[in-house]
From Swiss-Prot:
GO biological process: D-amino acid catabolic process
Cellular compartment(s): Cytoplasm
The keyword Transcription regulation appears for this protein: no
EC number: 3.1.1.96
Assembly and oligomerization: Homodimer.
Upper lineage: Bacteria, Pseudomonadati, Pseudomonadota, Gammaproteobacteria, Pseudomonadales
Catalytic activity entry: glycyl-tRNA(Ala) + H2O = tRNA(Ala) + glycine + H(+); a D-aminoacyl-tRNA + H2O = a tRNA + a D-alpha-amino acid + H(+)
Bilayer-spanning residue ranges: none
Role summary: An aminoacyl-tRNA editing enzyme that deacylates mischarged D-aminoacyl-tRNAs. Also deacylates mischarged glycyl-tRNA(Ala), protecting cells against glycine mischarging by AlaRS. Acts via tRNA-based rather than protein-based catalysis; rejects L-amino acids rather than detecting D-amino acids in the active site. By recycling D-aminoacyl-tRNA to D-amino acids and free tRNA molecules, this enzyme counteracts the toxicity associated with the formation of D-aminoacyl-tRNA entities in vivo and helps enforce protein L-homochirality.
UniProt note: domains: A Gly-cisPro motif from one monomer fits into the active site of the other monomer to allow specific chiral rejection of L-amino acids.
The UniProt record lists the keyword Protease: no
One Pfam family cited in the UniProt record for this chain: Tyr_Deacylase
Name the record gives this protein: D-aminoacyl-tRNA deacylase
Organism: Pseudomonas putida (strain GB-1)
Length: 145
């Protein structure tokens, strides 16, 4: 399971012109599920997202987590993050999970996030989405479980 974490001042996701998820300060995370993933990887990713210290403290040092600052968490499924780009001029998606497994594990991740954190939003799995964000820093990390 991969998560592209971006620290944001605000972000929203639209589907067909309708806002389906939005946060103020927090983390926008693009999530890709891979064929061998399970709930264990989803649990590990969520733990890291909630506790990874990417927000600045009073001294300007990245020392605070999403939980510490009470920020929002916007989860967006994006199977293209699992692409194999090593060969040729076209990405291969054979390294992405089948849609049924992807949907199951993304929904599980979202359910667990809602149970463990107050401010959680998401896009729609498999939908054509427009993601708007104000990247803060920019601060971006690729997490792989």
């Amino acid at each position: 399971m991969r998560g592209l974490l971006q620290r944001v001042r605000g972000a929203r996701v639209e589907v067909a012109g309708e806002v389906v998820g939005a946060i103020d300060q927090g983390l926008l995370v693009l999530v890709a599920v891979e064929p061998e993933d399970s709930r264990e990887q989803a649990d590990k990713l969520l733990h890291k997202l909630l506790n990874y210290r990417v927000f600045s403290d009073e001294q300007g040092k990245m020392n605070l987590s999403l939980k510490d600052v009470g920020g929002g968490l916007l989860l967006v499924s994006q199977f293209t993050l699992a692409a194999d780009t090593r060969n040729g001029m076209r990405p291969s998606f054979s390294t992405a999970a089948p849609p049924a497994l992807g949907a199951e594990l993304f929904d599980y991740l979202l359910q667990q996030a809602n149970a463990q954190h107050a401010d959680v939003a998401s896009g729609r799995f498999g939908a054509d989405m427009q993601v708007h964000l104000v990247n803060d820093g920019p601060v971006t990390f690729m997490l792989q479980m």
